[in-house]
Amino acid sequence: MSVYIIARVKIHDRNEYDKYSAGFSVVFKKFDGKMLSVDEDPTVLMGNWDDTRSVIIEFPSKKSALAWMTSEDYQAIAKHRDAGSTAHSILVNGLE
């Protein structure tokens, strides 16, 4: 069953975040991830959405998504994400 990671990101140091972005695709592809949406200015329909970037990504399984998140390669670039942004993310199951 496909799963989706939905992330909200507030970038506060573009230089650090760009280092994260530069290594992201290479690591992401190793785990069969698929980028569905990256939006710097999403339309808020309900509630507060103070973050500047919204991201939706797909993985073929929860196992694949968690393997990506915990991999050494991803953790090596995630330090730049953490230094350059404040992020919140959730993993949700797709409908089958």
Give short role names for the model-derived ranges.
Residues 82-96:
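C-terminal end-helix/capping segment
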